[in-house]
Every structure is written in C-alpha cells, then in structure tokens.
UniProtKB/Swiss-Prot annotation:
Protein name according to UniProt: Maintenance of mitochondrial morphology protein 1
Coiled coil feature spans: none
Ranges of Polar residues composition bias in the record: 65-74, 85-96, 407-418
Keywords associated with the record: Endoplasmic reticulum, Lipid transport, Lipid-binding, Membrane, Transmembrane, Transmembrane helix, Transport
Domain notes: The SMP-LTD domain is a barrel-like domain that can bind various types of glycerophospholipids in its interior and mediate their transfer between two adjacent bilayers.
Entries under PANTHER family matching the protein: SMP-LTD DOMAIN-CONTAINING PROTEIN (PTHR13466:SF0), TEX2 PROTEIN-RELATED (PTHR13466)
Lumenal side stretches: 1-22
Cellular-component GO terms for this entry: endoplasmic reticulum; endoplasmic reticulum membrane; ERMES complex
Keyword flag Endoplasmic reticulum: yes
Amino acid sequence: MSSQLNDPTPIPAQSSLSFTQGFLLGQLSVVLLIAAFIKFFIFGEAPPPPSRGLSHRSATHRRSNSIFSSAQHDGSTRTLREKPSNSNVLRPVPSSATNTRSILRKTYYTAIPTNPSSKHGRHRIHHSSHQPESLDWFNVLIAQTIAQYRQTAYLLKDSPTSSILNSLTAALNNPEKKPSFIDKITVTDISLGEEFPIFSNCRIIAVDDPNSDGGRLQALMDVDLSDDNLSIAVETQLLLNYPKPCSAILPVALSISVVRFSGTLCISLVPASTPPLDTPSHSPSPPTAQTTTAGRSKREDQTSGSHSHAGGSSKEPSGENPPKTSPKSNVAFSFLPDYRLDLSVRSLIGSRSRLQDVPKVAQLVEARVHAWFEERVVEPRVQVVGLPDLWPRMGRTGVRTGDDSETGSNVPRSSTAADASGSARHEDSSREPEVLRFGSLLGTRPPFDLASRTSSFNVETGDLRSRSMTREESNGNLSDQFHMPGSLPGSGVATT
C-alpha cells in the first residue's frame, strides 16, 4: 500500500509536443503573411494610370456637339421668293429636300430613329445603326498626299529661302513670342516620319441644331498613328540677364518625337452664314473663318489699292470697294477630348557636366504640347477651313501628255485668255522668290497650255502659319485664299 503511494505519476509527453507544434505553426504563419505582404504590396505592379478616355467619356457623351449651340440667327433666312424679281427664275428648294432625314434617305444611309427632345438644353447625338465604314480608300489618298509633302520637303531642303528648315527657324525665333531669356533657337534635326495615319470606323451621326432644319450631320472617324521617326530636335541657350545681360549661359538641347497618336476626328460642314463661334472668357477670342476672310480681303484690297496708286490711277482707294458677298462653305474639324498623344522627350542640359533626360523638362515640354493641341483642335474648339471653288474653269484646265485626245481637247484660246494667262504668269514670276512653290512630285508634270495653271501651295516663312492655298482665275487675280491649320507650337492660325 505504501509502495503504491510513493510511486510518482508519469508525465505525458504529448503536452510538450503539442506546444512545439503550435509554436512552429504560429511562426510559419507569420512568415507566410510577411512574405505575402512583401510580394503583393511592396513588389507588386502599380495599377495602370486612369485613361484619358475614361476620365472624359462621360463628358464626351454629355458634351454639346453643335458648334452653333450658343449663337442664334439675327434674322430669319430669306427664301428665293423674297429676292428681287431678276432671281425668281430659280425655283425654290423645299426644306423637306434639304433636311437631315431627306439626305440620309436619298443616299441610302440607315435612317436615324426619332429621339425625344434633349434635357437641360443639351444637344442629343443620334447614332445611326448603319455599318461603320473601313475607309481603306481614304487611307490610300491621305498616304499619297503625305508622301508627296515629304518628298517635296526633301527636294527643297537646299533652297536658300523656302526650305522647311528656314521656315521652322523663322517660326521658332519669332521675337513677338520668344521670351527674352531664350537665345536663338536652332533646328538641328527634322524627321517627317515614315508611317501614315490610319482612319477607320467612320460613322455618320446627327446632332440637334436649332439653326438648321432636321439637325446637322457629323462624320466621326477613328485615327491612329504610330511613328517613331516623326521628330524634331532643337538647340538653344538659356540666358541669365541679371545683374547684367548675358551674365550666365546654359546650353539646352531638346528632341521631341511623336510616339503614338490616336483619337476620334469629328468633321462637319459649316455654312458661311453661321455666326462666329464662342470662346471661353479667360482666353482671347481667336479669329473665326469669317474674320480671317474679311481681314484677308481687306489686305488684298489694300494691296490692289497701293498698286493702283503706284500706277497713277485716278480710282478711289480700294478699301472703299464693297466686299465680296458670295457665300462659301467651310469644313470644321476637331478631335474629341478622349485623344491619346504619347511623346518622347530627350534633353541635354549643360556644357561640361551635362544632365541628360531630365524628367521635369520632359513633363514641361509634354504639358506645353498638350496645351497647344487642346487650344486649337480639341472640342469645343474647332478648326474651320474654307472649301475651294470646284466649278470647272478654263484657267485651271490642263491636258495630260501622252493621251490620244490631246489634239481634240485643245480648243483655240481667245486673245483675252492668252493675255490673262500672261498676266498670271507675270505675277507668279514676281512672287517666286518670296514663297515656296510646290511643283512636281512624281517626275515631270504635263506641260499646260498658255491659259491653264494649277493651284499652288505657298509656305510663308515669316510666321507660323502653315501652307496657304492660293488660286488664280483666268483673269490673273488672286481669289478664294484660305489657310490650313498650323502644326507647330505658337502658331498664329485662325482658331475657333
């Protein structure tokens, strides 16, 4: 009995084993949690930045696509019956034949369903169920046009006064826009690219417009351009003008390349009688197509008046002549706010110890390029370009060489036409040293007869305006001149 009481009770070994297992399991779980945190939260990939398209998508659908939304006609449109009796021979066109629905029906485009009136005074976009167009033929035409521009620019690279290098240098060194702390800007490299923009997914939409019957039609098309060879490189110096001029000089070299551009291009026809477009109050009001045309006609009148005074003519000053009132149609184009413009900016600052590819410089340049682009061709701002006169005229008639019908197509010209062509050629020769004349791009062009000539593109080297198309009629006078939108920062192109 006493031996049983003195024997010690054996301690079970499972208690120490279970404690060790629990301790190891706890340490392992902590290690796994730390490893997962480091892997997924520290070394994980950053989320992609929000796309411009997503940020502006709601604004795109809610925006007012009518560029006439805030302008109203001062008076009702006069019909042909209200004109003087000498114009009553022309039959009036019924409004039902010129509205949007009639145009879509007669061109076999899918009819647009009737939608209720817009809310809050906003203009509705009526999308069509018609199959979008591929625009393959349009891409070929645009590619040929761009290729001819590139070839012309290369052929004229050695021109002393009309090369693209001199034009860009004069534009970048405009004393009215270049700050005083920047020295002369020298263009060191220009590449016009090798690829071509691709247009696709063209669709026609109708926009509610109170100024027109049945709304207004717009063409929307997607455009995409990927070209690493579209670049420009410049060199300049930053000047420190305190306490005395040119106290310190810092050399700067920049290279800007357009890596990719994509967006939605919006094109619509604008009648010449449309009121001017509204601009935000914080920026100066840019000239519209009408003001540009009026200013250009005024300059032409002043030029013709100076010639008349120089020749001893007794006519009154041409500034008092009544302006031409023939209506002209315009094309308005712009890009939707959800565009994408990727730039590659390389910089080199300093002379001895140089800083290469400074991120802050790249950000400043990209912001300036985006601001320049949005101030000109991004909704609600549009570029307005006047349409040329497409009526067939003998002054623009030419004959292709090598055709069998060359003899039969050459009708005798009158002495008046010959004199007019002679005066036109004299004016062309007098203006030749001042402007860049784009000639033949595909070898030799067919020789035209005495009274025929084609349109010519002129590049002005004094400012940043791009090529202006000038057309001369058979009487040798300049007419119907309009300016294409610019493509460089600081451009003085008419913007709406």
